Amino acid sequence: IIAVIVASLLAVKEHLHKFAKKIQMNEVFAAIKFALISIIILPFLPNENYSILDVNVISKLLAPFPSFSSFIGQLDVFNLFKIWLMVVFISGLSFVAYILVRLIGSEKGIGLTSFLGGMVSSTAVTVSLSEKSKGKKFITPFVFGIVLASSIMFIRVLIEVAVINNSLVSKLILPLIAMAFVGLISAFIVSKIKKQDVKEKVSFKSPFALGHALKFGLFFVFILVLSKTLFLLFGDKGIYIAALVAGLADVDAIVLTLSSLALTGLEPRVAVLGIILAVCSNTLVKIGIAYFSGDKKMAKRVLIILVLSLIVGISVALLV
């Protein structure tokens, strides 16, 4: 066995050297630190739902206000084990793509960078390529990159739903695949208009940086509380409002939230529509970023393609 391991290491020695050169040590340490913290902390976190009324001091402070206290008590969304598990899941999903982006590098062209970047952060790809499109003679590669990354986001959302609540996949797969299909086909057509490729570097923060993970965790908790609050106040409409608002900032948190809530009482149709609304909201934000941060001609092409993707996806959702 040892001989096989040694032989295998020698066979990939050159690739390991290349890997070491492209991955910075602080990124390695960040990943190790994150993994250790998760392994050590996760098993000890309580896997039960709490509300802030379970904090004795807060419970006493709200005791004179029974109606408000009763409402707050219904916001029992604080499950520390599941919250941190979601952070680990999203960070891990992003980190795989992040490592591939670092290994491949921008010298392989905007196509691969945008494809993998869409799995890390399609918004980051949009911001970076939009800013770099200004003053460029050829804008087609930038349209291609933004549309490609945005289309991959639809697939990423489907993966997240499949992992958290696969019962929703059957209702989401056709609309999301339709959106992705229109975007990917459009990106392919755009790439054939002019053959010029650009090798622009797209910057991402390591998903395993502890600060980045904690920020996502806090935002996820905020979206959980917001969604449950609006649901209690306005019913299904509250979920839709939360989805639209959350999608403006980050699609992952609301996708995880609605997928989780659908396991504990939220109607699947409401969760599905909420996820579609969040995806639409997030896509419209990327169109806005392209317009205000990038070349206007480039942004108009991005707008046409992505809006068409949304229209097709929504139409499919209404038919199924």
Write out the residue ranges for each language-model feature:
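Cytoplasmic-side transmembrane-helix entry/capping segments in multi-pass membrane proteins
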Residues: 2-4, 21-33, 105-116, 137-148, ...
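C-terminal ends of transmembrane helices
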Residues: 9-23, 95-104, 126-136, 188-198, ...
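Transmembrane helical segments that form the transport core of multi-pass membrane transport proteins
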Residues: 16, 198-265
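Membrane-water interface at loop-to-transmembrane-helix junctions
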Residues: 24-35, 71-85, 199-226
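Transmembrane helix-loop junctions at the membrane interface of multipass transporters and ion channels
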Residues: 45-55, 147-170, 288-295
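Entry/N-cap segments of selected transmembrane alpha helices
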Residues: 56-94, 174-179, 210-219, 296-311
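Membrane-interfacial helix-loop connectors
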Residues: 116, 120-121, 127-139, 145-152, ...
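C-terminal transmembrane helix pair
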Residues: 155-159, 173, 266-320
